[in-house]
């Protein structure tokens, strides 16, 4: 009996010493890369072609080949909102890429902002996150690390706006002429 009891403190000491209480290293750069409608097998299929920064992301980043988010309408706006905020898009009003706004009595783009002006070109539409009173990943990073810069770039307006969150430093998206533009919601 004495023999078996002597092992108990030794095992307890081993487990308590082997537990690592240190915090993980905080990364200097966080990139959320979303490729709309890209199948995950294409990442490995063309693996030998990747070089530079993309090669580094493939070798050292975290990527998900079978990620799912539960919402019924899988258009760009709702999907990118779910990724950028971790919330169900319909609950805050992102019910599609465009929808009928009862207050305005017209069909609107999900990131339409009638109070914003285009910055960066003469043509294009001003977009912003102003319709949504919620935060996202970029906002959480800035709230935890005040020196952080959040920049959201997308080919589509709703991609840049909805993945950037409420207060990114910049959101850039293409206009119909193929130029990157923004709105005065983000820059002056």
PLM regions with names:
Residues 96-188:
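His/Asp/Glu-rich, glycine-adjacent segments
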Residues 44-91, 149-153:
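Short, structured active-site-proximal loop/turn typified by the sulfatase FGly-forming signature C/S-X-P-X-R
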Residues 39-45, 69, 123-128:
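Second-shell loop/turn segments in exported
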Residues 8-16:
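Bacterial N-terminal signal peptides
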Residues 15-26:
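Bacterial Sec-dependent signal peptides at the C-terminal "C-region" and cleavage site
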Residues 1-8:
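Bacterial N-terminal signal peptides that target proteins for export
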Residues 27-39, 57, 83, 141:
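Beta-strand elements within well-structured catalytic alpha/beta cores of enzymes
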Residues 41-43, 76, 160-163:
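Extracytoplasmic/secreted cell-surface and envelope-processing proteins
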